[in-house]
Amino acid sequence: MNAPDSFQTDLDALHEDMARANMAPTWKYVSDFVAKEPRVGFRPWLWRWNDVLPLLMRAGDLITPERGAERRSMEHVNPDLKSAYSTSHTIATAFQLVRAGETAPAHRHAAAAIRFAARSKGGSVYTRVQGERLMMEEFDLLLTPAGTWHEHANETANDIVWLDALDFPLVNLLKASVFEPGDSDTCEPKPDDFSRQHLGLYRPVGWSDYPEPHPVMRYPWVEMKAALDAAASSGATGSPFDGIVMAYTNPLNSGPTLPTLSCRAQLLRPKESTCAHRATSSTVYFVISGTGTTVVNGTAYRWGPGDVFVVPNWAWHEHLNGDSDAYLFSITDEPVMRTLGIYREQAYAAPGPHQLITGEFDSTQQCVRELSSL
């Protein structure tokens, strides 16, 4: 009759001895590390341009190169990821301000980065990557692949603000972060459009192969917008989940923008309502123009020009556009998930392709209000 008690006593003793040996019983904790579906660990969030810009401009007066600030940027920190200073678990975005006449010194790091010109009046404002100058017209995308030397300069009379996106949360998780300061003459200068000329369809005979493992590229917004508009004009239906959407591809292999980050631009046509879906990738959005709503797990996030919002991995989401065309830029960690063989995507099917809206994000109070309290 004492057998069950003896079993439990012996099992408890085994567990205690295992703990002292720094071992863990899989039969007891398997559900903690082998989940039936992704455990997200952070919430959707939205940062309004009109709230962030005044803070950035105040920083422009206080944080200066003369006071030792190498970069003047403000991170979009998810409330659930404060210790990592990140926007999603793998992506960190920020707004960076470079005032008229300022420069930011050269450095390089293990994290890959992109720059998206959120507000620019053009002219001689640029990032120099591996010695090549990449100009920044408004809404242009510039790449800073992992380990590349880069510096910034604004030789105009106007401030510029761009969106930074880096994979440093992932790099830090892998304990692979490296940072190295440099000088403006660290890399031999290259002519403007060096990469586009070397990677184009036509190249002078006798030119050497492209020297970089990942392209140092500038993707002009005028070209991307023309591609989106042409697709819409042709009558293309686009994606049921994202409308007309285009990826910024790697010209060396037609793959993702960078090994860890894929950048995209999408056009939502007037009154367009996309179907809900979810994926094991997380995505950060920047609103180029237009107004609309993205519903994430039943909560409505209303957005306008300059706003930034994050959709966590495995979160149901869909877009509801307003009365005019809306253009969105986004960064996703989908390449990481595909490389690891763990990318999954699922369409929302019950009871239909759209979620029931149960709440709305209140950016003023920084909270979600349930419909019953609205």
UniProtKB/Swiss-Prot annotation:
Its EC number is 1.13.11.86. Changing H107A: Loss of activity. It catalyses: 5-amino-2-hydroxybenzoate + O2 = (2Z,4E)-4-amino-6-oxohepta-2,4-dienedioate + H(+). The keyword Iron applies. Inhibited by SDS and o-phenanthroline, a ferrous iron chelator. Partially inhibited by EDTA. One of its GO terms (biological process) is catabolic process. Optimum temperature is 10 degrees Celsius. It comes from the Bacteria. One of its GO terms (molecular function) is dioxygenase activity. Keywords: Aromatic hydrocarbons catabolism, Dioxygenase, Iron, Oxidoreductase. Optimum pH is 8.0. Changing H109A: Loss of activity. Induction: Induced by 3-aminobenzoate. Its cofactor is Fe(2+). Transmembrane segments: none annotated. Disruption phenotype: Disruption mutant loses the ability to grow on 3-aminobenzoate or 5ASA. Involved in the biodegradation of 3-aminobenzoate. Catalyzes the cleavage of the 5-aminosalicylate (5ASA) aromatic ring to form 4-amino-6-oxohepta-2,4-dienedioate (cis-ACOHDA). Can also convert gentisate, but the catalytic efficiency with 5ASA is 70-fold higher. Belongs to the gentisate 1,2-dioxygenase family. This is 5-aminosalicylate 1,2-dioxygenase. The gene is mabB.
